[in-house]
Amino acid sequence: MGQDQTKQQIEKGLQLYQSNQTEKALQVWMKVLEKGSDLVGRFRVLGCLVTAHSEMGRYKEMLKFAVVQIDTARGLEDADFLLESYLNLARSNEKLCEFHKTISYCKTCLGLPGTRAGAQLGGQVSLSMGNAFLGLSLFQKALESFEKALRYAHNNDDTMLECRVCCSLGSFYAQVKDYEKALFFPCKAAELVNDYGKGWSLKYRAMSQYHMAVAYRLLGHLGSAMECCEESMKIALQHGDRPLQALCLLCFADIHRSRGDLETAFPRYDSAMSIMTEIGNRLGQVHVLLGVAKCWMARKVQDKALDAIEKAQDLAEEVGNKLSQLKLHCLSESIYRSKGLQRELRTHVVRFHECVEETELYCGLCGESIGERNSRLQALPCSHIFHLRCLQNNGTRSCPNCRRSSMKPGFV
C-alpha cells in the first residue's frame, strides 16, 4: 500500500469513526496496519487506533498500540514522532491508573530536545501529568501542572486543550472541596464548547456536562445535577463512550444517594462497577465502592459497609490514591467508634492523620484541614492552597509551606 493510498484509507477510517461506525473504522485502520509499508502512514494509523480504543475504554488495547507506535517512531528517527508516541504511552497508563508510569513518560516527553510538536503537545503533556498527580492525591503538583497546561492553551489559542484543562480543574476543586470553583471551571469549559466547539467532537460537551453534574450534586442542586448528567449520558450512549457511561452511572447513583433513594442508587452503582471493572478503571471502582459503603452506613448495615470499604482500600492502595484512603479510614473510624472497638478505631485514626500529612490537606496558615467541608480556597503562585479567608486576614508576603520546606535540615 503506497503513501497516497495509506492517506486515503486513514481518511476513510476517520469519516467512518466520526459517523459512529466505529467497528468499520477499526477494520479499515487495521488493514492499513497489516498492508502499509510507509512508516509515517503506520505511525498516523496507530495514533488513530490509540484514540479510538481510548474512547471505547479498551485501555489495554490502547496501551498495546501505543507501544507499537513508539517502535515505529524510533524507526522514523524523528523527535516529533517520538514525543507524540510517548504522550500516547503516558495517556494509556493514565487510563489504566498506572500514575507513576504516566509521570515518568511525561517527564521523558518534557526531556526530549526542542521539537515542533513540543510547542503543540507540551500542554497536553502537562495535562496528562496533572491528571496523574491528581490520581496520586499530590495536589500541589497537580495544580502546578494544570496551570502550566492552561498557560500553553492560552499562549497557543488552543481552546480544545483549555476545555480539557478546565474539566480537570473542576475535578481538582471537587476533591479539595471548593465547590464554587468545582462548578466554575466546567461551566467555563461548557462556554468554550458553545463559543468555539461547532466542529469539535461532542465528547467535549459531554465531558463538561458531566463535571458540572458532579459539582451541582456536591452543592446540593440535585435537579441541575440530574439534567447535566442526563445530557452527558445521552452523548456517551450515542458515541459508545464506555468510560463516560460508567462515570455518569456513578454520578446518577450519587445523586439518588444524596436524595436518600438508596433503592435506586444501588443498581446504578452495580452498573457503574461492571463497566469500571470491564475497562480497568480501578480508581473509578474505588469511588463506586465508597458510594456503596455510604449507602450501607445509611441503612446501618455496618458489616456490608466494612466489606465495601475493605475492597476499596485494597484498590486505593494499589493505585496510590491517598485521598480515597483518607476517606475510607474516616468511614472505618466512624463504624468502629459506634461498635466501641478501640484498637481498630485507633489504627484508623492514626492512618487517617498520616494520609492528611501525606496529601498536605491542611491550611499552612490556620493549621485546619482542607477538604473536610466546602470552603473557598486560593492557590499562591507556588500552587500551595490555603483558605481564602486566611490569606485575606494574613496577607501573602510569602508561602508559609514553602518557607517551612526550605527550613527543613538537609541530609549531611
Swiss-Prot record:
Belongs to the RAPsyn family. TPR repeats lie at residues 6-39, 83-116, 123-156, 163-196, 206-239, 246-279, 286-319. The gene is Rapsn. A lipid is attached at G2 (N-myristoyl glycine). Ubiquitinated by the BCR(KLHL8) complex, leading to its degradation. This is 43 kDa receptor-associated protein of the synapse. A zinc finger (RING-type) spans 363-403. The modification Phosphotyrosine is found at Y196. One of its GO terms (cellular component) is cytosol. It comes from the Eukaryota. The modification Phosphoserine is found at S405. It is found in: Cell membrane; Postsynaptic cell membrane; Cytoplasm, Cytoskeleton. The lineage of its organism: Eukaryota, Metazoa, Chordata, Craniata, Vertebrata. The keyword Transport does not apply. Gene3D superfamilies: Tetratricopeptide repeat domain, Zinc/RING finger domain, C3HC4 (zinc finger). A cysteine-rich region homologous to part of the regulatory domain of protein kinase C may be important in interactions of this protein with the lipid bilayer. One of its GO terms (biological process) is motor neuron apoptotic process. It is a peripheral membrane protein. GO terms for molecular function: acetylcholine receptor binding; ionotropic glutamate receptor binding; protein-macromolecule adaptor activity; protein-membrane adaptor activity; structural constituent of postsynaptic specialization; zinc ion binding. Postsynaptic protein required for clustering of nicotinic acetylcholine receptors (nAChRs) at the neuromuscular junction. It may link the receptor to the underlying postsynaptic cytoskeleton, possibly by direct association with actin or spectrin. Keywords: Cell membrane, Cytoplasm, Cytoskeleton, Lipoprotein, Membrane, Metal-binding, Myristate, Phosphoprotein, Postsynaptic cell membrane, Repeat, Synapse, TPR repeat, Ubl conjugation, Zinc, Zinc-finger. Its main location: membrane. InterPro entries: Postsynaptic, Postsynaptic_CS, RAPsyn, Rapsyn_myristoylation/link_N, TPR-like_helical_dom_sf, TPR_rpt, Znf_RING, Znf_RING/FYVE/PHD.
